[in-house]
C-alpha cells in the first residue's frame, strides 16, 4: 500500500513517525511551504518536512494544492491512500479521487464537535472536560466526512493548549495506527456525522487572547490556558501590554466593593484580580521589555499597585 502523507506542524509528526515505524510505504510527504519565522524572519521548514527529510522521504511543498498540475503530480505518484493530519488546507475533490482507498484524516476533536483549524485551543477556552481524536474519511467539506474511530482524552483543570496538543498528537498516531489495521482487515465501519451536533473551531488569532475581566473567573482561567503557548492571553496595565501566562482560581468570595479588572492585592503569591463573579490570581506574566517570569520575581524590581485597573 503506497501512502502519501499530508501534514505540517508538530501535531502531525507522531503520525508520520508511526507510519515509518510500522513499515508503511510512505512514498511522499506533502507539507506547506517554508515560512518566515522569528525576529530575523528567516525561512523555517515545517516540522513534518524536517522529519521526512531525516528519513529520506520525498517532500512536496506546493504553494497551491488545487492546481491541475499538482493533482497530476500526485496522480503520477500512484498512491493507494492519502493520510492527512493538520495539513492546513482543504483538499480538492480531484485530489481526493486519486487514491483508490480514499483519504483518511486525523482530527483533534470528537467530531462533529469542533470542526475546523483549532479544536485543541477552543476545547480548553470553552471549558470542555473531555476531548479526543477522530479519524475520518475526508470529503470536500470542512471536517464533515464519515467518522471511523474515536478515542477520548480527559482535559485536566489546569492543562494548557500546549500540553493538550502534545498528548493529542501522540493519541492521534495511536488512533491512526488502529484505523489502518482495520482498513487492512476490511473491518472499518463508517459513521456519518450528525450536522445538528456540529460546532466550529475557527483559526486562533492574536486578538483572541485579549482578556475581558467582565467574564467569569472560570472563563478567564480557560482563556489563559487555551491560548498558552500561542497566541498568549493578554491585558493592559497603564497602557502597557501584559501577557498573562498562568493563573489560578482562588476562593476569595465575591465582594461588590471591587470592579472587574481591579487589582486587589500584589504579593509573592501573585496578582489578585477581580472578575465578574470572583477573583483570579495571576501567577506568571510577561511585558514586551522582559521575559516570562513568576510574579514574585517580577515585583522584586518592578512596582504594581493595588487598586490599578487592568484592561483598556
From Swiss-Prot:
Keyword annotations for this protein, in alphabetical order, are: Protein biosynthesis, Transferase
Return the broad EC class. Answer: transferase
- State the source organism's domain of life: Bacteria
Q: Any keyword DNA-binding? A: no
Pfam families noted in UniProt: Formyl_trans_C, Formyl_trans_N
Catalysis performed (reactions): L-methionyl-tRNA(fMet) + (6R)-10-formyltetrahydrofolate = N-formyl-L-methionyl-tRNA(fMet) + (6S)-5,6,7,8-tetrahydrofolate + H(+)
Note the CDD domains from the entry.
FMT_core_Met-tRNA-FMT_N, Met_tRNA_FMT_C
Residues binding (6S)-5,6,7,8-tetrahydrofolate are 109-112
UniProt xrefs under InterPro entries: Fmt, Formyl_trans_C, Formyl_transf_N, Formyl_transf_N_sf, Formyl_transferase-like_C_sf, GART_AS, Met-tRNA-FMT_C, Met-tRNA-FMT_N
- UniProt GO MF annotations: methionyl-tRNA formyltransferase activity
Q: Name one GO cellular component term.
A: cytosol
Its Enzyme Commission number(s) read 2.1.2.9
- Please give the function described in this protein's UniProt entry: Attaches a formyl group to the free amino group of methionyl-tRNA(fMet). The formyl group appears to play a dual role in the initiator identity of N-formylmethionyl-tRNA by promoting its recognition by IF2 and preventing the misappropriation of this tRNA by the elongation apparatus.
* Family statement: Belongs to the Fmt family.
Q: Which HAMAP family match?
A: Formyl_trans
Q: Which PANTHER family match?
A: METHIONYL-TRNA FORMYLTRANSFERASE (PTHR11138), METHIONYL-TRNA FORMYLTRANSFERASE, MITOCHONDRIAL (PTHR11138:SF5)
Q: What is this protein called?
A: Methionyl-tRNA formyltransferase
From the broadest rank down, the organism's phylogenetic lineage runs: Bacteria, Bacillati, Bacillota, Clostridia, Eubacteriales
